[in-house]
């Protein structure tokens, strides 16, 4: 019988005053009882509107029905038939803008907690001692190279391996996972408990992962074809090049890109005493930006011991691009929002250290091409926010290394690789997807592109083999 309660089961969490000083996971996950109760809120709609909002087409009502029955193993099999990274998606996907936004229960009340249920199923499976052994699919004799090991690449690799392809991932860093390991903090996405397990599952399927391999430097795409015998290449190298404000003072000591700041903490473990990664522990931090990365950077700064952390954003709260959940978590941990303020300069002392950031107050004008109201400067409203560190989190773009070393690879005006709706680039046999094409976007959209790329590569190689 359906549970007609209007609200979701709340997600158990660490107390904000405790968690803001540790890197343990904030959301603690559903119990079995909570998961079954939440699953019974699903109406099992025949037309499955929720599935249309999922970039990897998870059979949502089907897996939720199995959760409601207490058959968590069957639920896991349903999810992983289309999603190679369920424990990741259950934690970081913006479900409120995707599957849950389509949920019929959300018309009157809150939608079903689809993401929370997906996470529960994945965590239940990982915790099982008697998991069935992963059996690698038989090889079909065709080789594919994948550049990068973020969500797009991991998804593409998993799908291709299921089809029988011999897949090798080339990762520039010393650890696989891409943005999942260097960009998203431990307290949102545990690295050993979740990411490493998902990567290891792919290895058990037969995916080979080569780390410390910078394509475009150690070897080129042409060499992957000519010297290593790959029949297709998928570029999923992400968007790791930080964007800056281009204002006075950006070269002062204490100014970080969010990319560098988070990489030091997440990948290089600067927050742990048993690592010697250098990082500053500022007392007052200004973070520029309003997306999920800005929320992550601000919350990390608080956990490193900052007394005050401010997020400066040139629009209002309704225009913040970050997930509502991330904004609420930041606020509850004491992060202060300086909305309708735009940075115009960073100030420093005679030794070149940051002492403050100069902000100009803004008003909201007419909507821009994306429908968000444009920020309009208020004359004579400049003021200085005292701080000893500034973290710039206004976006990233694809690294130019691959495109600069690959002849005939067309790119967009913003530096992304030009690819059609099937992931095909201007080079025969070269496909691309995720942030390397679109610029910085969500994990699940990158995964959707990886699935598309795998399907296209399969069709391409089969057409060449006829």
Regions found by a protein language model. Name each.
Residues 436-464:
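A conserved FAD-binding loop/helix module that cradles the flavin
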Residues 74, 138, 143-147, 199-247, ...:
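Feature captures the FAD/FMN-dependent oxidoreductase FAD-binding
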Residues 121-138, 195, 200-217, 242-304, ...:
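Glycine-rich dinucleotide-binding loop and its adjacent helix/turn
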